[in-house]
Amino acid sequence: MSVNYMRLLCLMACCFSVCLAYRPSGNSYRSGGYGEYIKPVETAEAQAAALTNAAGAAASSAKLDGADWYALNRYGWEQGKPLLVKPYGPLDNLYAAALPPRAFVAEIDPVFKRNSYGGAYGERTVTLNTGSKLAVSAA
């Protein structure tokens, strides 16, 4: 995610929390005032949760984008379970946004890091570790 998308997401989260915090009462026969009491603690918690989720999605997307998808998919086929629906390409930013709230990609095994040389002619062979995996931890 670029900085502009992150700013837009934070602005939308703040506007959404303000809209939810101020709700006029629907019943005109009520003895209270026009609006209900706004609890600043709940509003601040909602804003913090939205910002944490956005930061988690950005961190997950950045870590997942640095993986060597060909080696990861080949490892899945060797184990008998294909890990990706498509045999090519990284998952987009929507995958990171679809993760559970406050979920982060904790660790990507170094064996699946993307090759800095591009992997064309003279690609080095990768010895895959049978214990290698993508780990996602929800807080």
Curated annotation (Swiss-Prot):
Which keywords belong to this entry? Secreted, Signal
Q: Which GO terms describe its cellular component?
A: egg chorion; extracellular region
Q: List, alphabetically, the InterPro entries matched.
A: Chorion_S16
Stated name of the protein: Chorion protein S16
Q: Which protein family is it in?
A: Belongs to the chorion protein S16 family.
| Gene Ontology biological-process entries | chorion-containing eggshell formation; dorsal appendage formation
Its biological function?
Chorion membrane (egg shell) protein; plays a role in protecting the egg from the environment.
What does the UniProt entry say about where the protein is found?
Secreted
Q: What's the superkingdom here?
A: Eukaryota
Q: What is its main location?
A: secreted
Which gene does this sequence derive from? Cp16
Span of the secretion signal? 1-21
Q: One Pfam family, short name please? A: Chorion_S16
